[in-house]
Amino acid sequence: MFDIGFLELAVIAVIGLIVIGPERLPEAVRSGATWMAKIRKMMRDTRAEIEVQIGADEIRRELHNEQVMKSLEALKVTKDDIQQHILDADRKMMLEQEAEEAKLQTPVSRRVAGDDPTLGTDDNVFTDPSYAHPPEEPSKVEADTSAETPQANNQDQQPTTKTEPANDR
């Protein structure tokens, strides 16, 4: 409140000692201190009364609350942005995973077929009547011929030409 340094206090003490005298100086200091305490108390009470009348505490609280609410709003916006980024990344990852699963679930013949939609499809399984009945059993003759050795089968498939060895005698 008062900005009094050591030098100013020394000057006031010397003037008080000269004016009041050494006998009454301690009593004057005590009465001055009590008057200062009463003035401070009166100023403190007046300030508190003015603050109550104006509502300074409420204004401070409201200002503080407004600042807190603004920072909360900024945090909510940041939180929403982060959640949106997380959801977008999660959706992207789910789509990639579903695409990978779909790729793994497609038959090999379809993947080999490429762009030709007719290759590798089994759509005619239900419409073609030849699929409705199992193939006929081979007759006994066919079964007996198929049981022959593979060498005999190879001879049937390839024409044989017999070459006679040349006699050198």
From Swiss-Prot:
* Protein name per Swiss-Prot or TrEMBL: Sec-independent protein translocase protein TatB
Q: Which organism is it from?
A: Saccharophagus degradans (strain 2-40 / ATCC 43961 / DSM 17024)
In the record, biological process GO terms are: protein transport by the Tat complex
Q: Which NCBIfam families match?
A: tatB (TIGR01410)
- Matches recorded under InterPro entries: TatA/B/E (IPR003369), TatB (IPR018448)
Oligomeric state and interaction partners are given as: The Tat system comprises two distinct complexes: a TatABC complex, containing multiple copies of TatA, TatB and TatC subunits, and a separate TatA complex, containing only TatA subunits. Substrates initially bind to the TatABC complex, which probably triggers association of the separate TatA complex to form the active translocon.
| Molecular function, one GO term | protein transmembrane transporter activity
| Topology with respect to the bilayer | Single-pass membrane protein
**What transmembrane ranges does the database entry give?**
1-21
Which family is annotated? Answer: Belongs to the TatB family.
- Composition bias (Basic and acidic residues) maps to 134-143
Task: From the UniProt entry, list the residue stretches annotated as the region Disordered.
Answer: 98-169
